Amino acid sequence: MSSSQQIAKNARKAGNILKTISNEGRSDILYKIHDALKANAHAIEEANKIDLAVAKETGLADSLLKRLDLFKGDKFEVMLQGIKDVAELEDPVGKVKMARELDDGLTLYQVTAPVGVLLVIFESRPEVIANITALSIKSGNAAILKGGKESVNTFREMAKIVNDTIAQFQSETGVPVGSVQLIETRQDVSDLLDQDEYIDLVVPRGSNALVRKIKDTTKIPVLGHADGICSIYLDEDADLIKAKRISLDAKTNYPAGCNAMETLLINPKFSKWWEVLENLTLEGGVTIHATKDLKTAYFDKLNELGKLTEAIQCKTVDADEEQDFDKEFLSLDLAAKFVTSTESAIQHINTHSSRHTDAIVTENKANAEKFMKGVDSSGVYWNASTRFADGFRYGFGAEVGISTSKIHARGPVGLDGLVSYQYQIRGDGQVASDYLGAGGNKAFVHKDLDIKTVTL
């Protein structure tokens, strides 16, 4: 048996045990993992500093450096809080979603159940190990994790803490060793992608190239998105203050995020639209990749107002219309163009977006509703920043990733996206041959029951 097959088999074995553990046991180990990571914050930070130093020496892109830095701002604290938030969420396993009486003493239930074994592959985001550990254990799934080489030292340190904690408290919580396994080599990943007998779902978190490569090389279902090309449309009835604040936040709050705005669509009838572009550059340092008609109108208006500065001119460049509207910049750059209507904005987004998250800024409810129904993305917002597309902000505690698929899970994937369901029938000796359709003459009752009153 190959090492990858053994890893996958061990995960399946652990998952079969984990799904039978009580919610109390699964939540308890998460609190203990939280405490252990917090207690070892210094060791984790030192490991992270090593990764950052190596990354800078090798010329890692700024967007990836920002993702790699686990102690930038409150990222580490948010990660820890996410573990506690997941622990405190309602148990996603064993929830009755449907109950139907088939006959007297014969009842059908649709009950949530873990997916099984997750293979999660991520690049330069060391906090993912904590997020996935929390979500997988809480949802009764075993997880195999592969971090990027950029975060290898942070990854190892955190993995050791997580696994030592699970082992230390196995007899107390019931959560088995093997519930979370860590792998390091690309060969392990390639081999594991062939283990469709044991692995139920692959979750890639990283670059477009990573996600597409995985989708092309495995039979295992893949949950994820390939790009984060998020657009904001400024309608003719947009509020200027809202437009400026939302656009600035969506682009500059965290440019390397997959939920950052990459495209700004502007209705030319929107009063003082140029102030939004001006604000993005002067307040946010954003470079505007503008279409020729937009750039001309922008410069003409600022020149008329005596506000066309050298800084504005340097930070406004010609858009490559063949590429820029299909591009995830992950930097302080965005593509901008005029669109003449809500319908035109919808058409542009559905043609160029990655179906991640898109927003409209308007005070016109009819236009907002048209936009939200017409845009084919996992998240569609009205008068809110695309940066809200996040499991933590949705109250999911954390997220496995963001799915742009329309099947199973869509948008930020939290606990609910990591459970499937099974059908359970609870009877009293009934056999199918007694009923119509199988040789008998008994009819089914097919009476739906109120799931709020059902106790299994």
UniProtKB/Swiss-Prot annotation:
Signal peptide: none annotated. Its EC number is 1.2.1.41. It is an enzyme of class 1 (oxidoreductase). Pfam families: Aldedh (PF00171). It catalyses: L-glutamate 5-semialdehyde + phosphate + NADP(+) = L-glutamyl 5-phosphate + NADPH + H(+). One of its GO terms (molecular function) is NADP binding. Keywords: Acetylation, Amino-acid biosynthesis, NADP, Oxidoreductase, Proline biosynthesis. Gene3D superfamilies: Aldehyde Dehydrogenase, Chain A, domain 1, Aldehyde Dehydrogenase, Chain A, domain 2. InterPro entries: Ald_DH/histidinol_DH, Ald_DH_C, Ald_DH_N, Aldehyde_DH_dom, G-glutamylP_reductase_CS, Glu-5-SA_DH, GPR_dom. One of its GO terms (cellular component) is nucleus. Pathway: Amino-acid biosynthesis; L-proline biosynthesis; L-glutamate 5-semialdehyde from L-glutamate: step 2/2. The modification N-acetylserine is found at S2. Present with 6920 molecules/cell in log phase SD medium. Belongs to the gamma-glutamyl phosphate reductase family. Catalyzes the NADPH dependent reduction of L-gamma-glutamyl 5-phosphate into L-glutamate 5-semialdehyde and phosphate. The product spontaneously undergoes cyclization to form 1-pyrroline-5-carboxylate. This is Gamma-glutamyl phosphate reductase. It comes from Saccharomyces cerevisiae (strain ATCC 204508 / S288c). The lineage of its organism: Eukaryota, Fungi, Dikarya, Ascomycota, Saccharomycotina.
